């Protein structure tokens, strides 16, 4: 950690089989953090070995969901100020310098939390593209006032939420410099993540009593491809952006398809009514239904 920082920062990263990316993530935070904690979900690759070799404190924790893992990580951070990045992210050198300047000048407590711009980096790129899409997320915050644990009814939508008794008006500052979010290591990895994440989302939605219409399921991919490729500007990545947008749209479709499946399993009595609205062409003569077609 830089000796210029007057208040110390705890950085944490949650991982599962991130041997290919964890070094980049840790190296981008270790110069501004007093401690780097890796909460690992029983990786079977060299994630733990690499993290420990870089000086990180590794705690193995069976998977609790995205919110659960990050909430647990907060509890073992010794400092009030917490910096969270994911294993597929990296703080730019400029952002590291900006954070160091704020803390070295003792101005960090003017705000309760800081938002970071996460520039999307395609896995084949070495630097950000012009007009690359980005997301703004609260990733640097004082845990006395905010926490991932305040997220309600979700194990997947991991966001820092302020305590109910905290007035956070004008207390969040968006940092000028950016971090980089890498889109994935391969198409195979993106598809595997889409399959896993959509299942977790479906479980969250069924707990909330959600049930999608068949029309919504049928049109979900069309809308989300349009949103990813055009509105979120994945077109800047060329044909690679087209491929990733298709995978993203498919993930959104899977989320609703799995939700429908769970809904039918939870309430079998609705199945006969649901079948009446499905887009299945029936033969005029009754025949045994092929469930693989449904």
UniProtKB/Swiss-Prot annotation:
Q: Give the EC number.
A: 2.4.-.-
Task: List the transmembrane segments.
Answer: none
Is the keyword Endoplasmic reticulum in the record? no
GO MF terms listed in the record are: glycosyltransferase activity
| InterPro entries found in the cross-reference section | Glyco_trans_2-like (IPR001173), Nucleotide-diphossugar_trans (IPR029044)
Which parts of the chain are coiled coil? none
The domain of life is Bacteria
- Matches recorded under Gene3D superfamilies: Spore Coat Polysaccharide Biosynthesis Protein SpsA, Chain A
* Record has rRNA processing as a keyword: no
User: Keywords on this record?
Assistant: Glycosyltransferase, Transferase
Do you know which Pfam families this protein is assigned to? Glycos_transf_2
Protein family? Belongs to the glycosyltransferase 2 family. WaaE/KdtX subfamily.
Q: What is this protein called?
A: Uncharacterized glycosyltransferase RBE_0523
Which species is this UniProt entry from? Rickettsia bellii (strain RML369-C)
